[in-house]
Each structure stands twice: as C-alpha cells, then as structure tokens.
From Swiss-Prot:
Expressed by the venom gland. Negative results: does not have effect on TRPV2, TRPV3, TRPV4, TRPA1, TRPM8, Kv1.2/KCNA2 or Kv4.2/KCND2. Belongs to the neurotoxin 10 (Hwtx-1) family. 62 (Vatx) subfamily. Transmembrane segments: none annotated. This is Tau-theraphotoxin-Pc1b. The keyword Transit peptide does not apply. One of its GO terms (molecular function) is potassium channel regulator activity. Selectively activates the mammalian capsaicin receptor TRPV1, a non-selective cation channel expressed by sensory neurons of the pain pathway. Is more potent than VaTx1, but less potent than VaTx3. Interacts with distinct regions of the channel than capsaicin, since it only acts on the extracellular face of the channel, and capsaicin binds to the cytosolic side. Also activates avian TRPV1, which is insensitive to capsaicin. Produce weak inhibition on potassium channels Kv2.1/KCNB1. It comes from the Eukaryota. The modification Phenylalanine amide is found at residue 35. The presence of a 'disulfide through disulfide knot' structurally defines this protein as a knottin.
Amino acid sequence: GACRWFLGGCKSTSDCCEHLSCKMGLDYCAWDGTF
C-alpha cells in the first residue's frame, strides 16, 4: 500500500514514507531527522 505522509496515521515506522517515523503513542508520522 501507499506510505503515510507527515501527520498520517501509523502503527509502526514502516507505515510511513521515507524520512518519516511513526511517533509511538501519538500514532502519526513525523520527520525522523534524516535527509
């Protein structure tokens, strides 16, 4: 399936697009600090 963009809902980092990570407990994708 499609990856989740910034502030998209997620269950794990693998749900998120490149350079995003799933914020545990908040359940959304946010920048992981990489370029």
